Design a protein with these regions (language model features):
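Short histidine-centered loop motifs in beta-beta connectors
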Residues: 1-10, 39-43
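Short beta-strand-turn/beta-hairpin segments enriched in glycine/proline and small hydrophobics
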Residues: 1-2, 16-34, 239-240
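A structural signal for short beta-strand/turn segments enriched in small hydrophobics and glycine
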Residues: 8-22, 45-57
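Short, Lys/Arg- and Gly-enriched loop/turn segments at beta-strand edges
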Residues: 23-30, 58-68
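Intrinsically disordered, low-complexity segments enriched in small/flexible residues
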Residues: 65-173, 177-184
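A structural preference for short, pocket-lining loop segments at secondary-structure junctions
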Residues: 159-179, 194-221
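Extended active-site and interfacial segments that coordinate phosphate-rich ligands
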Residues: 176-202, 207, 268-270, 276-280, ...
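Conserved catalytic cores of soluble enzyme domains
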Residues: 213-284
Length: 284
């Protein structure tokens, strides 16, 4: 990919001499000893085979002042593209959604993230698909979708529960929660796909699943779909297959209808607050 030295250059042990591309990954080749570059046997764009020489370096004591140590790197610097990703993720956090949090406070209910964070041990939750948005780009501007449909209304991932009492492997759980502040916690195309993936992981790893199921069921307003019906959605089949695989716990506060109620009803244990309304049909 690139050469960082030329014949006659003094190099110190550990200096990156060249960068090679293999299997779509870039690999640094560093000097194993200090010395002088005598000649180089490759050029950018060449195909390199196993055991082929790349360059010849004659070992020598090298004056530190004569060695180009390269550009100093600030290890605390965050690249602009990474900063953009972090800012994008942060849009879905409660502290950046004050209006949504206020709506939950008004009904004396908790947010989806509060429930997940309080259930899992601190620092153990690995969220899947936090930057997913609703499949509505044909009807809604992208910026609005990013602001109003974080995670497409489904927070899900793997975390540990009661890790202080059990070994790490035994404490590991799949934790999922519909987010009622996002389109009434309805089931959209992207959060269905997220569920499909997480259910398959739970089956493979035999993970207990805790699912906060508040929400209004199927969402009719998604536009970015390729099928006329939802017969291609395997989520409910995958969810049913988890029965007997590991414990399934459903929790609900508030309204839980249609597809959300199916998720809840298939659980081994259901925990519902007194203000819950659960049914296969009804208002979202």
């Amino acid at each position: 990919v690139s050469l960082n030295v030329a014949p006659g250059d003094a190099v110190s042990e550990g200096k990156v001499l060249l960068i090679m591309d293999s299997m779509k990954m870039e690999h640094e080749v560093a000097a194993e000893a200090s010395g002088i570059v005598q000649h180089i046997d490759v050029a950018p764009g060449d195909t390199v085979f196993e055991d082929s020489p790349l360059m010849l370096i004659e070992e020598a004591d090298v004056d530190a002042d004569s060695v180009d140590i390269g550009q100093e790197v600030d290890l605390d610097h965050i690249r602009p593209d990474l900063a953009e990703v972090e800012a994008r993720r942060a849009k879905g956090y409660d502290e950046n959604r004050p209006e949504a949090v206020a709506r939950r406070d008004k009904t004396n209910q908790r947010t989806a993230r509060q429930n997940v964070e309080d259930l899992v041990d601190e620092g153990t939750f690995i969220e899947y698909g936090p930057m997913v948005i609703a499949a509505r780009r044909r009807r809604t501007p992208l910026d609005e979708l990013i602001d109003r449909t974080p995670a497409d209304g489904l927070i899900g991932g793997i975390g540990e529960v009661n890790g202080s009492l059990f070994p790490e492997e035994d404490a590991r759980c799949m934790v999922m929660s519909y987010d009622y502040t996002v389109l009434a916690g309805t089931q959209g195309k992207k959060n269905h796909q997220k569920k499909d993936r997480l259910f398959r992981i739970a089956e493979t790893w035999r993970l207990p699943v805790v699912f906060f199921a508040e929400g209004g069921g199927g969402r009719p307003g998604d536009t970015d779909v390729e099928f006329a019906a939802n017969l291609h959605t395997p989520a409910f089949n995958l969810w049913g297959k988890l029965s007997g695989n590991a414990p399934m716990v459903g929790i609900v506060s508030g309204r839980c209808f249609a597809g959300n109620a199916v998720i809840l009803g298939c659980c081994d244990t259901v925990i519902a607050t007194a203000n819950s309304t659960i049914g296969m049909g009804g208002p979202a």
